[in-house]
Amino acid sequence: MDNRPVGTRQARELLRVAFGPSVVALVVIAALTLLQLLIANSDMTGALGAIASMWLGVHQVPVSIGGRELGVMPLLPVLLMVWGTARTTAAATSPQSSWFVTRWVVASALGGPVLIAAISLAVIHDASSVLTELQTPNALRAVGGVLAVHAIGATIGVGARIGRRTLTASPLPTWLPDAFRAAAAGVLALVGLSGVVMVGSLVVHWSTMHDLYAITDSVFGQFSLTVLSVLYAPNVMVGTAAVAVGSSAHVGLATFSSFTVFGGDIPALPVLAAVPSPPLGPVWVALLIVAAASAVAVGQQCARRPLPLMPALGKLIVAAATAALAMSLLGFAGGGRLGNFGDVGVDQATFAPAVFLWFVGIGALTLAMSGGIARRPKRATPAPVPEPEPDMVEDEPEVLDDEAEVDEAEVGEAEPEPVDNVAVPVDGEPPAEEEYPEDPEDHFVVDDDGTRDGNGEAAE
């Protein structure tokens, strides 16, 4: 995307970010609402109010009908809305985008849904004059819910594009993306394994689920129950995750945990057949394996890039805290008040701490066993310097010799060596005879036998 927020292409992208996911949700909700009214042979009075209420319900805004509050909204639509917002904002943001363009993208992702929320509130207020049982929700609660959902999606989308660049320019540690990736892996593992447990429990309680489907005789009614069960399946998975980590989930007075179950009335929703019934069998204690396996996934993700001890532990703690915060947020969004049944949700006082302790404890053990802690290289000890011995000094005599040679050269220049007197021949005189060394035989004494005279000549 170009850094200039003007032009046809930029305006089209910003419009897609602002209204794309919200308009798609409105179209789907309108189609389902009109289909329901047509099948029920009902008139279209208040259809717009129902559509607006359902759109706000996607953003976890409670709906009040006839004095009864429906605060437990399905998690699947809100998760799809977060995913759609993250996808559109990521597509409109490039890794090289300036902060000016990024601010425009985030503002569009928040401004468009808030505008639709204001219109929906006005439509509901107008429809409540016709449908007296429909009540207008709190405006602050409605706008806050819409802002929260789209802010989470925009943060995920923009962070995926420029998060690493922002982190490089900040003083924060460089292992933060790895910690967030490990937290996402832990959350997906915990929720996914809880879903497997939920499906297994539905198979075990198949007869109970069949009885819940029997409350309606029409095919369309059973189809509607199936759709509702699919929409509320993530809520049940989050409750199963709370039970798996040692916390508890409750539907009104009915409370469920891995150690005990207190019975009570539950809504006639087929997916709720997965909840255990008292007395609790010992097999449910095996749910703790789900928490341990999810913690192993966190530790393995943190061990992908080994770090020294303290940074490795810091990365694991950040990952565990992020995962605990995400699960707590899912538990809060998936709960609420359900009419006469009372409050539905998880125990928030123990859910997030339990997730954190599982991920830190088992995750640290996995981190150490998987080689995620890098050992610091040992510092090479310098070799000891040998002390100089008196008889092994080699350089000093050479320096002295050089100095002696320099002194001798200076003395030689100052005092030239004496030259022997050489006799110079004078004109007219014969050259002097060369001096030869004396013959040693001249000094020998030989006995005279009379054959030679004193001059060395033979006698006659």
Question: Across the structure, where does each feature detected by a protein language model lie?
Answer:
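Cytoplasmic membrane-interface segments at the C-terminal ends of transmembrane helices
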Residues: 2-14, 83-103, 122, 153-183, ...
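Long, glycine/tryptophan/cysteine-rich extracytoplasmic
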Residues: 2-83, 124-131, 215-287, 332-357, ...
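Alpha-helical transmembrane segments and their helix-start/interface "positive-inside/aromatic belt" motifs
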Residues: 6-31, 95-110, 138-144, 174-191, ...
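Alpha-helical transmembrane segments of integral membrane proteins, especially early/N-terminal helices
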Residues: 26-42, 68-73, 100-119, 145-156, ...
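Membrane helical hairpin/interfacial module
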Residues: 62-110
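Hydrophobic alpha-helical transmembrane segments and immediately flanking/interface helices
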Residues: 94, 135, 139-143, 205-227, ...
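Hydrophobic alpha-helical transmembrane segments of integral membrane proteins
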Residues: 96-132, 185-197, 267-287, 309-342
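Alpha-helical transmembrane segments and their membrane-interface junctions
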Residues: 192-208
